[in-house]
Curated annotation (Swiss-Prot):
It holds the Pfam family Na_Ca_ex. It comes from the Eukaryota. Its main location: mitochondrion. The lineage of its organism: Eukaryota, Metazoa, Chordata, Craniata, Vertebrata. The chain crosses the membrane at residues 96-116, 141-161, 169-189, 206-226, 228-247, 326-346, 361-381, 384-404, 417-437, 446-466, 492-512, 526-546, 560-580. Inhibited by the sodium/calcium exchanger inhibitor CGP-37157. Strongly inhibited by zinc. The gene is Slc8b1. InterPro entries: CaCA_antiporter, NaCa_Exmemb, NCX_ion-bd_dom_sf. It is a multi-pass membrane protein. Residues 1-26 form the signal peptide. It comes from Rattus norvegicus. It is found in: Mitochondrion inner membrane. GO terms for biological process: calcium export from the mitochondrion; calcium ion transmembrane transport; glucose homeostasis; intracellular calcium ion homeostasis; mitochondrial calcium ion homeostasis; mitochondrial calcium ion transmembrane transport; regulation of cardiac muscle cell membrane potential; regulation of cytosolic calcium ion concentration. This is Mitochondrial sodium/calcium exchanger protein.
Length: 585
């Protein structure tokens, strides 16, 4: 039996040894330092000589604040808060642990903001847009919904690539999330519920992902990403979308011709085509159920507004556990702010989630949020002709538009152009996610300065964990409910979008922004090769072992993946702290 070949416990050990050997040999010809981080720069852009900001911790406590203020390497490109200045200028040295603790709690809350915004506001509006454009489920699943599910990862990558000093976070987070999802999440699914994998979607997705990883590994080896290379990433994703559409069409055509008798639909008898369709919608959120009003019948404008702004469902509140209630309390301020600023269109409801007073109010507030979050509010405070700032003009125009809409519509029936609110909600939620992602990147960089950690290790641990934990819980829940194939398919489908669009679009925007011909990559540490090798080994292991098991995934396979991730983290930490290093020539 081919499946029994993988049962012995030496498989995880073999993977760990292979990871260490791949790390030592793959980077053996590189003249690099043992402890370092990826440095990115755009060719043709003047760069100011500066000291590494992480040197601040080696200075006297009285000199740290002045060093942070004067050193350009300690300044953030975007964001609303200066975290390094807060640590070294506003907190006394003896309260540094308190500052770090507060930053960690704020980081966790930012991850919560990212998750709530993406799940309850960004994804529903993308779904409404795809419905308005009459896209098929497969096209919507690999485009709009993939963008919605990967929004935190994508925006974190775009923000990180925008600053050469934090671009290592992007590579670390995208590769780190890839290792995490293909080992811990995929392995956890098979441990919770062993199942028969869908062969064609699995082979297709893992092949495309391996090509994407190989392209990124090659770019790191060459030390640059050109404009053509960045466009190639995006073109490869377009080719992936076309492949999914064609494969689905061919399969459905063959099925319609060869179908002789009907097959009863059970959770484990889903076809490959149905698996694709369902996995593309795994993370959609039924926001209408939670915010459904308690009162029925004719309601006044004031009642509609109050109920639309209420993020708490009292019926669910009474049945929730203490931990769920505490989490809900933490989310209430975020949900209220998002309900106030982000319109949501629901094509599945009779009224399409039309809330006349709230939607009219959002015509004023949402554009204001757009100009105040774009580039951290730089454009919002710009004065037009030296008379009025942009935000004031936006408020005036929005108020006029809201007044016309309010008096031209009714509470009971949505207007004919109500679907346009989905685009407004999409833009507003996207900029909220971008603003939160900017703060996440800045906090992680500040923690890296304090603990003298490279951006790469922060990206592959904290940033990757934070952005992937929501998808992990969703996939585990699907597996426990009897849909492991759907959850397993979602593991590989989502990370393809993240790496191709994250790297491609991030580098493309950096090239356009800096007016350079390429983005130069300078991996001066062994850690990035550990990361790339680990991801490649995990994919090769799955590509070989899954077909050998005849696509019948067992708990032993899941345990091998989990042990591999543990070995990977151990090797990463040993490399980061210089225990594993290259010998000097």
């Amino acid at each position: 039996m081919a499946g029994r070949w993988l049962d012995p416990l030496w498989a995880p050990g073999f993977l760990c040894v292979a990871l260490i050997l791949e790390t030592a040999s793959g980077a053996g010809d590189l003249s690099t330092k043992a402890h370092g981080h990826i440095q990115f720069s755009a060719r043709g852009v003047n760069q100011t000589a500066m000291a590494d900001c992480r040197a601040v911790c080696s200075l006297n406590t009285s000199d740290r604040c002045d060093f942070v203020k004067r050193n350009p390497d300690c300044h953030s490109e975007g964001g609303y808060l200066d975290y390094l200045k807060g640590i070294f200028c506003y907190f006394p040295p003896n309260l540094l642990p308190l500052a770090i603790t507060l930053y960690v709690f704020w980081l966790l809350y930012l991850f919560l903001i990212l998750g709530v915004t993406a799940a309850k506001f960004f994804c529903p509006n993308l779904s409404a847009i795809s419905t308005s454009l009459k896209l098929s489920h497969n096209v919507a699943g690999v485009t709009f919904l993939a963008f919605g599910n990967g929004a935190p990862d994508i925006f974190s990558a775009l923000v990180a690539f925008s600053d050469p000093r934090t671009a290592g976070l992007a590579i670390g987070a995208l590769f780190g999330a890839g290792v995490l999802v293909t080992t811990v999440v995929a392995g956890g699914i098979t441990i919770l519920r062993p199942f028969m994998a869908a062969s064609r979607p699995f082979l297709r997705d893992i092949t495309f992902y391996m090509v994407a990883v190989f392209l990124t590994f090659t770019a790191l080896y060459l030390g640059r990403i050109t404009l053509v290379w960045a466009l190639g990433y995006l073109g490869l994703y377009v080719f992936y979308v076309v492949t999914v559409i064609i494969c689905t069409w061919v399969y459905q055509r063959q099925r319609s011709r060869s179908l002789v008798h009907s097959i009863s639909e059970t959770p484990e008898l889903l076809t490959d085509s149905e698996e694709d369709q369902m996995s593309s919608n795994t993370n959609s959120y039924d926001y209408g159920e939670e915010y459904r009003p308690l009162l029925l019948g004719e309601e006044t404008t004031g009642q509609i507004l109050l109920q639309a702004l209420n993020p708490l469902d009292y019926r669910k509140w009474r049945t929730q556990s203490i931990s769920c209630k505490l989490l809900k309390v933490a989310k209430l301020p975020v949900e209220f702010l998002l309900l106030l600023t982000v319109p949501v269109v629901d094509p599945d409801k009779d009224d399409r989630n039309w809330k006349r007073p709230l939607n009219c109010l959002q015509l004023v507030i949402s554009p204001l949020v757009l100009v105040l979050t774009l580039q951290s509010g730089v454009y919002g405070i710009y004065e037009i002709g030296g008379l009025l700032p942009v935000w004031a003009v936006v408020v005036i125009v929005g108020t006029a538009l809201a007044s016309v809409t309010f008096f031209a519509t009714s509470n009971s029936e949505p207007p004919r152009l109500h679907w346009l609110f989905a685009f407004l909600g999409f833009l507003t939620s996207a900029l909220w996610i971008n603003a939160a992602a900017t703060e996440v990147v800045n906090i992680l960089r500040s923690l890296g300065v304090v603990f003298r950690l490279s951006n790469t290790v922060l990206g592959l641990t904290l940033l990757a964990w934070g952005n992937s934990i929501g998808d992990a819980f969703s996939d585990f829940t699907l597996a426990r409910q009897g849909y492991p194939r759907m959850a397993f398919s979602a593991c590989f489908g989502g990370i393809i979008f993240n790496i191709l669009v994250g790297v491609g679009l991030g580098c493309l925007l950096q090239i356009v922004r800096s007016h350079a011909s390429e983005v130069k990559l300078e991996p001066d540490g062994l850690l990035v090769w550990v990361l790339a090798s680990a991801l490649g080994l995990s994919l090769v292991f799955s590509l070989v072992s899954v077909p050998l098991q005849c696509f019948q995934l067992s708990k032993a396979y899941g345990l091998c993946l989990l042990l591999f991730y543990i070995c990977f983290i151990v090797v990463v930490l040993l490399t980061e702290f210089g225990v594993i290093h290259l010998k000097a020539d």
